[in-house]
């Protein structure tokens, strides 16, 4: 018996219908990416919205923004950035995914709740006397 270890083979790339499967995150940044799976694209929209919520929550908390101006600013930026992403950058047909409104509201309330929590935590930690 030899004391050598077995060399593990690197994992093979995943195949989908005989073609190489492209990573979801590599498709996010490519404007010419094809989204065959509707749920995969909606997941990207959902998580992109959560990232925006965290970033804006931190910024709004560090800046002394309060009240309606902060909430309205979040809603406009969150919806606007995602609308520009899927309509102008990706240039997808919104009707394939349920229309513009369906994509605009995908994960919005969850991101709004996350934004509020992050905003309150940072604002309280920095500006509370």
UniProtKB/Swiss-Prot annotation:
Pfam families (UniProt xref): EMC6 (PF07019)
Cytoplasmic side: 1-44, 85-103
Domain of life: Eukaryota
InterPro entries reported for this sequence: EMC6-like (IPR029008), RCAF1 (IPR010742)
Bilayer topology term: Multi-pass membrane protein
Record's keyword terms, sorted: Endoplasmic reticulum, Membrane, Mitochondrion, Mitochondrion inner membrane, Transmembrane, Transmembrane helix
TM segment ranges: 45-65, 67-84, 104-127
GO cellular component, one term: endoplasmic reticulum membrane
Stretches in topological domain Lumenal: 66, 128-129
Subunit and partners: Component of the GET- and EMC-like (GEL) complex, composed of RAB5IF/OPTI and TMCO1. The GEL complex is part of the multi-pass translocon (MPT) complex, composed of three subcomplexes, the GEL complex (composed of RAB5IF/OPTI and TMCO1), the BOS complex (composed of NCLN/Nicalin, NOMO1 and TMEM147) and the PAT complex (composed of WDR83OS/Asterix and CCDC47). The MPT complex associates with the SEC61 complex. Interacts with NDUFS3, NDUFA4, NDUFV1, NDUFA9 and NDUFS8 of the mitochondrial membrane respiratory chain NADH dehydrogenase (Complex I).
Function according to Swiss-Prot or TrEMBL: Component of the multi-pass translocon (MPT) complex that mediates insertion of multi-pass membrane proteins into the lipid bilayer of membranes. The MPT complex takes over after the SEC61 complex: following membrane insertion of the first few transmembrane segments of proteins by the SEC61 complex, the MPT complex occludes the lateral gate of the SEC61 complex to promote insertion of subsequent transmembrane regions. Within the MPT complex, the GEL subcomplex may mediate insertion of transmembrane regions into the membrane.
Protein name: GEL complex subunit OPTI
Protein's organism: Canis lupus familiaris
Organism ancestry: Eukaryota, Metazoa, Chordata, Craniata, Vertebrata
């Amino acid at each position: 018996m030899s004391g050598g270890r077995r060399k593990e083979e690197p994992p093979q790339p995943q195949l989908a219908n005989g073609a190489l499967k492209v990573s979801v995150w590599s498709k996010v940044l490519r404007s010419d990416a094809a989204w065959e799976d509707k749920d995969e694209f909606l997941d990207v929209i959902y998580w992109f919205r959560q990232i925006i919520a965290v970033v804006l929550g931190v910024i709004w908390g560090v800046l002394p923004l309060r009240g309606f101006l902060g909430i309205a600013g979040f809603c406009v930026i969150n919806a606007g950035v995602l609308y520009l992403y899927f309509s102008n950058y990706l240039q997808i047909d919104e009707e394939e995914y349920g229309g513009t409104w369906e994509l605009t509201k995908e994960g919005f309330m969850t991101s709004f709740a996350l934004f509020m929590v992050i905003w309150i935590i940072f604002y309280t930690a920095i500006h509370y006397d």
